[in-house]
């Protein structure tokens, strides 16, 4: 099918509103994407006419809600090409998924003297859980350093591995720089050293196809809200053999087989033993609608459109005086920048006055900010509903700010 950005934009109600008397240019989808009417309506319809608690309910509404929820698990498994739907755990988002791995697999497999490898470009969600695990067990956290162009110093990676390396935890795409890491070679190297690999896919799954079997990663995690779905829902993929060995990290209803005050508790099988309590069923069903929406458009079509838009944006931004861009020329989704010596908050505030929404701050990547010796950056992110005209408005806005502030 031919990708039509105008038709896509018509599906997103919020894109028709104004901000400060001007049409909204929403360039903040890397933080959280807007939702198409199809997602909003599907979740609302569930709450209006189909809501019930899932699992163990004998009545019709409960059985139907359970079936819908489990169908989304199957749908998500196809979306990332997992071998089985039972390799997928519903989580609140990428952060919870990584914490689940750290507290379940990590507590069982990482010991004093072991080490975990991350990179200098990671989001805090892929740093802090590993820092906490290492502190608990006496393990070492090793870091792949950055190059100035926003790529990793991959030549250092072989020197970081040894017989005590248990995990490589790496982002698929940097949320600040847009760098897409060469996962295939990194995963192969990790497996050659007997280490497992966790991939933070929060900034990847909306931009192009992801095939977890082809990647051969052990864990892959992403959030629904960045994929045009609801907040509070995400997916953790774990290879089946690993998942079956992992102990639960939260206790409660739905994750048990038996509970006895005298004989203790036994767990149900994976993935359900990692889904304690009442799930976010509405969010899960909304995620299913988002997956259906994106799949119907075609991720290859989306990728082609977004890459053309990114190339246009980078070329047009060259006309802005005193603009510093961070990250490689070949990138996905995001453009981080600073304008002269002006603080990112000031630049972002001016852009907001022009109806342009960008993200400002450290972007949950303070080690990366420290590497570039800046307290903050502005970040414009480009999604499938953004346009060349919105890029032009961003460029014009930055030129105007430069004239005003010098």
UniProtKB/Swiss-Prot annotation:
Disulfide bonds: none annotated. Pfam families: Aminotran_5. Coiled coil: none annotated. One of its GO terms (molecular function) is selenocysteine lyase activity. Signal peptide: none annotated. Its main location: cytoplasm. Pathway: Cofactor biosynthesis; iron-sulfur cluster biosynthesis. Keywords: Cytoplasm, Lyase, Pyridoxal phosphate, Transferase. Its EC number is 2.8.1.7, 4.4.1.16. SUPFAM superfamilies: PLP-dependent transferases (SSF53383). InterPro entries: Aminotrans_V_dom (IPR000192), Aminotrans_V_PyrdxlP_BS (IPR020578), Cys_dSase_SufS (IPR010970), PyrdxlP-dep_Trfase (IPR015424), PyrdxlP-dep_Trfase_major (IPR015421), PyrdxlP-dep_Trfase_small (IPR015422). The active site is at 364 (cysteine persulfide intermediate). It catalyses: (sulfur carrier)-H + L-cysteine = (sulfur carrier)-SH + L-alanine; L-selenocysteine + AH2 = hydrogenselenide + L-alanine + A + H(+). The keyword Ion transport does not apply. One of its GO terms (cellular component) is cytoplasm. PROSITE patterns: AA_TRANSFER_CLASS_5 (PS00595). Its cofactor is pyridoxal 5'-phosphate. Transmembrane segments: none annotated. HAMAP family: SufS_aminotrans_5. Homodimer. Interacts with SufE and the SufBCD complex composed of SufB, SufC and SufD. The interaction with SufE is required to mediate the direct transfer of the sulfur atom from the S-sulfanylcysteine. Cysteine desulfurases mobilize the sulfur from L-cysteine to yield L-alanine, an essential step in sulfur metabolism for biosynthesis of a variety of sulfur-containing biomolecules. Component of the suf operon, which is activated and required under specific conditions such as oxidative stress and iron limitation. Acts as a potent selenocysteine lyase in vitro, that mobilizes selenium from L-selenocysteine. Selenocysteine lyase activity is however unsure in vivo. This is Cysteine desulfurase.
